[in-house]
Amino acid sequence: MADSTASAAPQPAHPADRPVYVIGAGPGGLAVAQALRARGLRAVVLERAGHVGDSWRRHYDRLRLHTTRRLSALPGLAMPRRFGRWVSRDDVVRYLEKYVEYHQLEIVTGVEVFRVERASDGGWLLHASGGRELTGSAVVVATGYNHTPRVPDWPGRAAYAGEFRHAAEYRDAAPYAGRDVLVVGVGNTGAEIAVDLVEGGASRVRLSVRTVPHIVRRSTAGWPAQYNGVLIRRLPARLVDRMARPLARISVPDLSARGLPRPDTGLLTRAAEGAVPVQDVGLIDAVRSGRVEVVAAVDGFEDGKVLLADGTRLAPDAVIAATGYLRGLEGLVGHLDVLDDRGRPVVRGGSAPAAAPGLYFTGFTNPISGMLRELSLDAGRIAKAVAKHEGTAVSRLPG
């Protein structure tokens, strides 16, 4: 097994040596590599960073999974009970490192793949850092849902001299103690950062909201919200939307007076559009108590102030933009006609695009049933598809 912390690069493949190349050593890439290995197929995972789980290492300190330990484990290795029900960021990283060791996965770090092309013989040619050209029988793209921080093109943003950073740079509340902070965006990241700032001693925390989210309790009477997500994921959206409304009224207080009315769009309809519910880890109480103040959407920046959609002008000490991420796939595979108009893969899991058989994607959706659970399911589907369609061309493991 290649050292998962080394920077050694793979050698150009011999014509008879055509592994499946997996791009990205996060949970999705590792799960696919394990599923392929379980079928006796050689998978080489290429990771641009110096270690596995790089994006997880860069998350904010207080992060814990919003999905349960049991439903967050990857195929073939349970998460230890000592991790608790809601697994911490650091324990996720430890688990990924152990996963590589336990399954003897072939990981090569320090290699960034810039472009994937169809090879003349029907395989795949990967153009990577250092001028490397690697040839594989199939390619799995697992570069991650949160790949490239997205910052809206707000008027005046470039000239704004105040402290501004994307949530990807946020680690903890210590630098903001005693300061006035505006958090922009109320997805799970923005909501949790706002709570972290309040608990960490920020003097004032305001949360800028453009689209009101659905808020759900992470667990109700011991029943995790994820279990509901698993149960309803294949039901008609209109049915789930109707079912969710009375449940929300029972479990989540009306926050309209504090600037967070209940959404007009249904819960599953919104989730299908990519906006999963915000799981409450303290936001409800913080908003009810006034410690987190909800304000209007940001419209721009002017004269050192933040302009809101309702005409308000704010002068916070710091702005943290929890405005999401781009998939960042255009340079890698955009020329292959495999992305939609929003830059997302047109297929996932065991389905390859009609224009690019042998090319697979995992981890580019945000399912209500839990990302890690769906990555595990995708891994099995991809391995099955590769074995069926590209199996005779893939390098086999010895034994």
Question: Where do the protein language model's features map onto the residues?
Answer:
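Flavin (primarily FAD) cofactor-binding/catalytic cores of flavoenzymes
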Residues: A2-A49, G53-S55, G84-W223, G229-G399
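N-terminal glycine-rich dinucleotide-binding loop that anchors FAD/FMN and/or NAD(P) in oxidoreductases
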Residues: H59-G84, A225-L239
